[in-house]
């Protein structure tokens, strides 16, 4: 027996020596923007959801988390780019002022990042399936030569909730003013005219003076009425023909201008322009706080951010979100410019040309786009403590628990951590000014953005989202250098458009000269 055991032990040891060591997971370097300096980068290494994604992909991450204010992080990003030594994966706002001059298109032209088409085909089944099932989304993620250059959080914008989660502004009114003049919130252009007239003549602020501003058009408020005339501000798609048009170069624009000029002439709109060049006026806030503005372009957080200060002037003040006015041709309710299908101007994730293991980098990112990966970057993991005790997973994903007494979200370690640390929102618990998104590549799961909001915030976003976005021009943000030059030339006409729009609305130029305006645009 002893001899047998000794022999068996010896054989076992020999087999162990002969067997190859278990392969270690490949490691990729991941460069990401964090929050301000107070947010500890080590959290990226400790969050359970991100650990789970690495486990799913069989890939480890060596993090570089850049923290600080705008100037500080821009300096670090520029220094990294100038060094010529690039991390494997770079997650950043590459296409805006904090990013690379020329955006990801120029990064590709300069040899900094790789094209992803073959990478997606070979190593990213989750992501490839999403693109195949959502061809319209896929188009917006390509450059104008059909290349995929970056990854980004994607909202498919199909369900009402998905639309509402990125719809945070629209038309708003003083609810108490509507009650004071005995009217309901308007739903058509004609009803808007009637309500604005009542605001002007009915002394709804109750100070016995005709000082009301029925519609404060600050921050481009009048542009929100363009979809009611079947056009948008800039490029749009005609839903009936499928052809691309330009809002300010159309006969529908003349009808829009006629209505806006009428409102302006009758004193129903004010604070439209800052100067005679057609520069749009600043926000409606001063007139709002002075108890003078009856309607305006507002954000869904105005109940929290603006109403308390208005109540200091008028304790009876209250706001109400107003739906987009129905199209004048009777085709329904439409709008655009609120939730676009362009993603490149947000945080985008690229794979650099210095990446020695593109397959590992691709597997990691693809795991984030899986259903489980999306849950990980949104909720954490079902079995992680304390999430399991604080969140409901009966629907296959996490859901915040709302305290019935306060109506507030029940705080969890995960929620506080991910919100405080991840740049560009992650959880919108502390990111108060707009609904936001997780910056990591991910798909859908828009429901989390609604779970932490005040009831009126959610209700207004849902109301504004109840409209067709068929006018939306799904242009890809990423353009090659030649295309960028062409767009720049097109943009040169904007000064003329702004100047003439100012003149038409204010009456400085009669609308009988609209055909001349159209001819001049054609020449330009």
What residue ranges belong to the model's regions?
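Loop/turn elements at helix/coil->beta-strand transitions in domains of secreted/extracellular proteins
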Residues: 24-29, 57-62, 83-88, 110-114, ...
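Sec-dependent N-terminal signal peptides of Gram-positive bacterial secreted proteins and lipoproteins
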Residues: 4-22
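Short, solvent-exposed loop/beta-turn-alpha elements that line the ligand-binding surface or hinge
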Residues: 114-133, 176, 184, 234-251, ...
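Conserved N-terminal structural module of periplasmic/extracytoplasmic solute-binding proteins
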Residues: 21-191, 229, 234-236, 244-248, ...
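Helix-loop-helix "hinge/cap" segment bordering the ligand-binding cleft or interdomain interface
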Residues: 117, 145-148, 152-221, 238-287, ...
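Extracytoplasmic/periplasmic substrate-binding proteins
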Residues: 34-49, 157-172, 179-185, 218-269, ...
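Conserved small-residue motifs centered on glycine
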Residues: 367, 371-502, 508
């Amino acid at each position: 027996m002893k001899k047998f055991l000794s022999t068996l032990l010896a054989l076992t040891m020999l087999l162990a020596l002969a067997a190859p060591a278990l392969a270690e997971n490949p490691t990729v370097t991941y460069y990401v923007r964090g929050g301000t300096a107070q947010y500890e980068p080590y959290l990226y290494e400790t969050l359970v959801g991100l650990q789970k994604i690495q486990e799913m992909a069989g890939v480890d991450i060596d993090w570089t988390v850049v923290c600080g204010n705008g100037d500080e992080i821009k300096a670090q990003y520029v220094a990294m780019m100038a060094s010529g030594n690039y991390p494997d994966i770079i997650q950043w706002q590459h296409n805006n002022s904090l990013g690379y001059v020329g955006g990801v298109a120029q990064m590709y032209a300069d040899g900094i990042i790789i094209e992803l088409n073959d990478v997606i085909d070979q190593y990213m089944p989750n992501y490839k399936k999403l693109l195949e099932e959502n061809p319209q989304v896929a188009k917006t993620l390509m450059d104008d030569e059909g290349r995929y250059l970056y990854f980004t959080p994607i909202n498919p914008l199909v369900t009402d909730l998905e639309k509402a989660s990125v719809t945070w502004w629209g038309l708003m009114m003083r609810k108490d003013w509507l009650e004071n003049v005995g009217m309901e919130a308007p739903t058509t252009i004609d009803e808007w005219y009637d309500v604005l007239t009542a605001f002007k003549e009915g002394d709804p602020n109750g100070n016995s003076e005709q000082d009301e501003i029925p519609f404060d058009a600050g921050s481009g408020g009048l542009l929100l009425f363009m979809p009611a005339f079947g056009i948008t501000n800039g490029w749009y798609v005609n839903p009936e023909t499928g052809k691309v048009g330009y809002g300010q170069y159309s006969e529908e624009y003349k009808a829009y201008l006629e209505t806006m000029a009428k409102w302006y002439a009758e004193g129903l709109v004010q604070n439209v322009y800052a100067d005679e060049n057609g520069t749009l006026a600043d926000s409606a806030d001063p007139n709002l706080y002075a108890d003078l503005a009856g309607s305006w372009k507002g954000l869904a957080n105005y109940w929290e951010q603006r109403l308390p200060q208005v109540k200091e002037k008028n304790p009876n003040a209250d706001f109400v979100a107003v739906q987009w006015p129905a199209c004048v041709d009777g085709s329904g309710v439409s709008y655009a410019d609120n939730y676009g299908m362009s993603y490149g101007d947000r945080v985008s994730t690229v794979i650099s040309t210095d990446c020695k293991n593109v397959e590992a980098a691709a597997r990691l990112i693809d795991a984030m786009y899986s259903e489980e990966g999306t849950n990980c970057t949104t909720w954490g993991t079902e079995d992680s403590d304390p999430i399991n005790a604080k969140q409901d997973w009966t629907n296959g994903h996490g859901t915040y628990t709302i305290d019935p007494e306060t109506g507030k979200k029940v705080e969890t370690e995960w929620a506080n951590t991910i919100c405080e640390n991840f740049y560009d929102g992650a959880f919108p618990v502390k990111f108060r000014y707009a609904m936001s998104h997780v910056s990591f590549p991910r798909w859908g799961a828009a429901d989390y953005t609604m779970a932490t909001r005040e009831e009126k915030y959610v209700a207004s976003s849902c109301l504004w989202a109840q409209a067709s976005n068929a006018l939306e021009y799904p242009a890809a943000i990423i353009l090659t250098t030649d295309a960028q030059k062409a767009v720049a030339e097109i943009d040169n006409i904007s000064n003329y458009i702004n100047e003439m729009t100012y003149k038409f609305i204010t009456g400085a130029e009669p609308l009988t000269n609209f055909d001349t305006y159209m001819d001049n645009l054609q020449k330009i």
